[in-house]
Each structure stands twice: as C-alpha cells, then as structure tokens.
Amino acid sequence: MIDRYKHQQLRIGLVSPEQISAWATKILPNGEIVGEVTKPSILHYKTNKAEKGGLFCERIFGPQKSGICACGNYRVIGDEKEDPKFCEQCGVEFVDSRIRRYQMGYIKLACPVTHVWYLKRLPSYIANLLDKPLKELEGLVYRDFSFARPITKKPTFLRLRGLFEYEIKSWKYSIPLFFTIQGFDTFRNREISTGAGAIREQLVDLDLRIILDNSLVEWKELGEEGPTGNEWEDQKVRRRRGFLVRRMELAKHFIRTNIEPEWMVLCLLPVLPPDLRPVIQIAEGKVMSSDITKLYQRVIYRNKILTDLLTRSVSTPGDLVTSQEKLVQEAVDALLDNGTRGQPMRDGQNKVYKSLSDIIEGKEGRFRQTLLGKRVDYSGRSVIVVGPSLSLYRCGLPREIAIELFQTFVIRGLIRQDPASNIKVAKSQIREKEPIVWEILQEVMQGHPVLLNRAPTLHRLGIQAFQPVLVEGRAICLHPLVCKGFNADFDGDQMAVHVPLSLEAQAEARLLMFSHMNLLSPAIGDPISIPTQDMLVGLYVLTSGNRRGICVNRYNPWNHRNYENQRSKNNNYRYTKEPLFSNSYDAIGAYRQKRIKLDSPLWLRWPLDQRVIASRESPIEVHYESLGTYYEIYGHYLIVRSIKKEILFLYIRTTVGHISLYREIEEAIEGFSQACSSSYGTYTKLSNSRI
C-alpha cells in the first residue's frame, strides 16, 4: 500500500518480470507459491464464491471479509497469539480485506507480447531504439512476416539455399512446402524469428551506450555536410537529425533510470487488484463485471488455448500456433489500449470496452478526476464577474459562499463574544442570518486570505491569493487585471475558492501567492497584470471620442442640423454646442445627468501652459462677445482673451471618457507617491533611531 507520508510522487514506467512476480507472489506456510491467475472464471457455479485461481481468487488477492477465509473460519487480525496466519484448508490469509485494493496477481503468457504503448504510440520507442520503420515492426509483431535468425558457425537452410537474406514475407507459404509438420516446427524454432519474441531478441542485443555514441557521431557528420541545394534532400537530413536527437534522449533516459529495453516486451502480465475492477452480483448466478475484467478474461482464454497448443506441438500445425499467438497479442493490446490497432473490441451490445488507458487518461480518467480533481472541504465554486472597483489584491466573495466557508470561524466568534452559548445556538443564528453574524464574518475575513483557482492550473499563476470582501449576488468578483494569469475571461468562466486553514498555509498565501506580488510572468519575466480582452475594448470605447472635427458644423449643413437642432427623447441632449466646463467634476456631473454623452466633445478649463501661449499656430475661428472678450478656437484647444488681449482661460477639447481615464491615472500616481513617501519616512525614522 502507498504510504502518503513516505511517497510524495507517482511515476509510471517499465518494470522487470522479476519485479512483477515479486509484487504478486505469496508463499503459503505449506510452501505453495500463489499469485498466478490461471482461470478466467469469476464465481464458482456451485458455491457462488470466488473461483480458486481465478480473477477474484481469495488466495491470491486476500479475503473478501476481514479475518474470514473462504471456508468461513475467523481469526483476529493482528493478534500474535493466533496461529497460523493462513487457513490450512483453503490457503487464504487472515488479513484485512483492504488488501484486495493493492494486492496484485499476474498472468504467465505463453508467448512474449509487446507493450502497445511503446510500439504503437507516437513516437514509437521500440522503433526509435531499433532504428527501423514502425510499419516493419508491426508486421513482425503481428506475424505478417519474419526474418532469419543468424546462427554463427552453423550451416543453415536459408543461407545454403540463398532463398532469403533478411526479411521473409512469404515464409509461411513457401517454406512449409518442403517440410513435414514436425520438420517445419524444428526449422522455425531454429532459424526463423517472428512475433514479439523477435523484437525481444533484438532489444536484448542492444547496447545503449554504443547507440548513444553512434547516434552522436552520425548527428555531427550530418551537421557538417551543410545544405545541398536540394530541398527534398535537406528536409530528409533535418528529419534524420531530429530522429537522432530523440534516439539519444531515449537512450540517456533508459541508462539514467536503469531500465532494460527488453522490458518493453511482456512475459508476465500484471493483474489489477480486484477492488479496482469490482464485480456486482445482480441475481442468482448472474454477475455484472467491469470492462477490465472482461478483457482479462479474454487474455486468459486465448493464452490458455495457446498453452494447450504448445504442449501438444507435435501434432499442431505451425499456422495454427502462429494465429493463436497473434490473437494473444491482440487481446493484450485491447486490455492495455483498446482501439489503438484497427477496430476496437466490443461487447454483445456493440459497445467498446474501456481499456486501462481509457481508465487512466482524459478528463474523466483516474488521475484528473479522482487524484487531481478531488473535492475538498472549505472550498466553493462559482462564476466570475468583473469587479472594477476592487483593489488588485481583493476579490468579491458572495455572502452565501462566505458564510459556508467561514462558518466554523464565525461559530467560534459567536461563542467568544457571548451572543451564542454553544455550537447549536450559533448555527441557529447563522441560519436565521442575524446582523451579528455578518459583523463577525467581516471581522473573520479581514485577516484571512482565500485562494482562487481556475482549472486547468498550468502554471504558478493559475492559483493566487486574495483578500476577500463581501459582495451581493452569487458570483465571485475579480479584478480584471489578474485575468491573464488565470487565462480567464468574463464569458461564464468558473473559479474555485479555497480557504487556507493552517498558519503555514496562510503565511505562504500572504508572502508568496497574493496577486499584487505576482505582477511578472515566471516563465519569461514580462508583465502579466496588463489590460486584455474586455478591458482593451472598454478603454477603446472610453477614449475613442467623437470623430467629428471642430469644423464639421460649419462645412456640413446636414451634420450641423443633426447636431445642433435635433433633440433626443427625455431631453438627454440639452447642449446644442460643444459646452464649456470649469472642472472635471462638472463635466462628469453633466454626463451622469444625461446632458452629454460619453463621447461628446466638450471644452474643459485647463491650467495655462507656456507651450500653448508661445505657440505660433493660427486659430481656426475667432468668436467675439458683446463685452469685448473673444474666443480663439484651435484644433485641440481654445483660448479666452480679454479686451486687452490678455489670456483669461485655456480650454482643451476632450470627452468625458478621456476625463475619467485621466482621473483614474492621476489618482493611481498620487496613491503610489503617497505610499513611497510614507515608506521613505518610515525608513528615515528607523535610521534615525538606530543612529
């Protein structure tokens, strides 16, 4: 069993046949060795119990009930005085039934079988190491052709006759004509190699260090040749160099992890523990089993037939044995990865069996759904919406979610402050949503960060810490600038919220995971808290303004009539000309009263600028007033002069959107300056105190 304190990681890889046998083998007190599954049966047809030597055998995988053997005898688990530890009649060990979740078995295959993951998956590791085309290896594995086994210092039929040099695609049609059945079997076993056994022989002969050295030499030679001018030849060289790089990396990995290449060919097939492929008894003598169990049954059926054929090989035709070996290979392929080669295996209702790969991989696989996507306590989930008024390090948490996540803390606060005498009364107050509950919830949330996570968590910024604040509604409010780190947008995305409980987790959240401390991408160092998607569109709309120039009313009578004389409903457009405002507050107030629009051009009083005063630009228009003052109208600004030609006021041409953006930037700069000055003052005080 995996100890969660000792084992902090999980790795899927190759193991030796000896290791598989060690995992599954048990030695009984009488010296009998058990662990091999030899029967495809699930339940015995008479006793309706697990078949001995079958896929649910209690001798191999452990008792179905803790401390009770197949005979019905009972022993106290863990009692040193109880002896023996095994039942002498049925051979079942007196242990906890949870052993059936991790005790494995094995099937001894009558012929070697290649592991489909390492043969059919791209890139093919077997084809990479052997430096041969995948199509050729597939034909060899599935008995479509064979090659001559080299035998040194011995005359061979193939070499003497000179009929075949290496590959013999027609061996099963031409050679048997010259032999009897017994003679052909002897010839085949001596000089012809086919199937997974042929692959295993070649993998055993490999020297990984020689492969590494030869591949490196060839890679350097191809790099020194340079381009030939022929595009097809150059592309062929590039592909070969890429293949050599992958081959060297694979050889290095095998050397570093002490993995032998021949382990990619199976001689012993591990059998999963029975509780991971359960069986349900639905009626008398009828059971419902998992797809994995049915695929195991098919492997055992075909392997048993092949074993019987090999035991009486004197009278068995060679073609029959070869065909049965191919069926065993296909059955193991379907068990490991159904449908990888050709049509997948189906049941009586034409439903595709779920193989081991289907159980492991994908969104609904064992890793992503059960191990990585587990439901945890003190967590919630909801849709995210934009919260533009929030600070960068804050998030809006709905009251419904917050009261559930922080319920234990609120109960403790109610009991400490004496509004509630016990837990039952405190829960009653929470259900009734009394005002004191929200006050205590606010106090609890002030010093407690939360973690927001958006799946899939592909990098460090996929989960960040925030200071929660209560909001109305049922959606989580999020500052728009943190969306890029989460790869989120506001079109219905959901995010999970978690509450760190321990002091270590809270300290880690505050010191390392707060959003305002993760402003740069950990991968490339670029700023990651930048406006994206909806924010860019909003900034464009806010600052686009009206495209009409300042002379549009004068030279376009149609626009002049529409802009000056036309009135919209509800008196929403009272200003017939571009209005003048003395400050930004008046302009925004007019917008809120719906007297002007967001992109309506207006004149805003601005401090006198020496660059404008010294400018030699000629005005477009000059408007005179009855009291002698006049307005000089330029492209982007307006100057009000007195009768003595003195500059009274300066106005700039802008919109409410530009004003709003400018005010936000100005407030942000002022806040940053105040923060810097306060921190500098604190540093000065500390320095003076030390002096």
From Swiss-Prot:
GO cellular component: chloroplast; DNA-directed RNA polymerase complex; mitochondrion
Gene name tied to this protein: rpoC1
InterPro entries tied to this protein: DNA-dir_RpoC_beta_prime (IPR045867), RNA_pol_asu (IPR000722), RNA_pol_N (IPR006592), RNA_pol_Rpb1_1 (IPR007080), RNA_pol_Rpb1_3_sf (IPR042102), RNA_pol_Rpb1_clamp_domain (IPR044893), RNApol_RpoC1 (IPR034678)
UniProt GO MF annotations: DNA binding; DNA-directed RNA polymerase activity; magnesium ion binding; zinc ion binding
Protein name in UniProt: DNA-directed RNA polymerase subunit beta'
GO biological process, one term: DNA-templated transcription
Subcellular location: Plastid, Chloroplast
Cofactor note: Binds 1 Mg(2+) ion per subunit. Binds 1 Zn(2+) ion per subunit.
Record HAMAP family: RNApol_bact_RpoC1 (MF_01323)
Organism: Jasminum nudiflorum (Winter jasmine)
